[in-house]
From Swiss-Prot:
CDD domains: SpoU-like_TrmL. This is Putative tRNA (cytidine(34)-2'-O)-methyltransferase. It comes from Synechocystis sp. (strain ATCC 27184 / PCC 6803 / Kazusa). Could methylate the ribose at the nucleotide 34 wobble position in tRNA. Its main location: cytoplasm. GO terms for biological process: wobble position ribose methylation. HAMAP family: tRNA_methyltr_TrmL. It catalyses: cytidine(34) in tRNA + S-adenosyl-L-methionine = 2'-O-methylcytidine(34) in tRNA + S-adenosyl-L-homocysteine + H(+); 5-carboxymethylaminomethyluridine(34) in tRNA(Leu) + S-adenosyl-L-methionine = 5-carboxymethylaminomethyl-2'-O-methyluridine(34) in tRNA(Leu) + S-adenosyl-L-homocysteine + H(+). S-adenosyl-L-methionine binds at residues 102, 122, 131. The lineage of its organism: Bacteria, Bacillati, Cyanobacteriota, Cyanophyceae, Synechococcales. Keywords: Cytoplasm, Methyltransferase, S-adenosyl-L-methionine, Transferase, tRNA processing.
């Protein structure tokens, strides 16, 4: 299954919700610091409910630390951004892909955008809407990748 990477997430309930989605889908969750909260934050724990024991959680102190880990594992690093040039529906996912999303306020740091194998976007037909909620985006991306990978085999 693909892996999910959150770079500098800021809002504990979003990350908790994403952790619950990762538990439900069997997806590794990689958090890249600095975070906008402590891992013991009560809102983070509450959003993840009692599913935390089922979350395959990995914490990296910095982008550089994560990059070293990712390079050791291999696979495509897929950045998600409102300015992405490839529609996420049109991308053919592989089980070794890493789906990477940035913070709720700043998106992906430029160095992570530059490192991405592809920069994907989730289309939004209403230009007045700047972005989707991070937890919603993560769920949309994970379930599309999962749908494609199940249909392949």
């Amino acid at each position: 299954m693909v892996k999910l990477v959150l770079v500098n997430p800021q809002i504990p309930p979003n990350t908790g919700n994403i952790a619950r989605t990762c538990a439900a889908t069997g997806t590794e969750l990689h958090l890249v610091g600095p975070l906008g909260f402590e891992l013991g934050d009560r809102y983070l724990k509450r959003a993840g409910l009692d599913y935390w024991p089922y979350v395959d959680l990995h914490y990296h102190n910095s982008c550089e630390e994560f990059i070293t880990h990712w390079r050791g594992q291999g696979g495509n690093l897929l950045g998600f951004s409102v300015t992405g040039t490839v529609n996420f529906w049109d991308y053919t996912y592989q089980s070794t892909d890493w789906l990477m999303m940035g913070s709720e306020t700043d998106g992906l740091p430029q160095m992570m955008r530059d490192l991405s194998t592809q920069l994907l976007c989730i289309p939004m037909p209403h230009s007045e809407v700047r972005s989707l909620n991070l937890a919603s985006s993560a769920a949309i991306a994970l379930f599309e990748a999962g749908r494609q990978l199940r249909s392949l085999g």
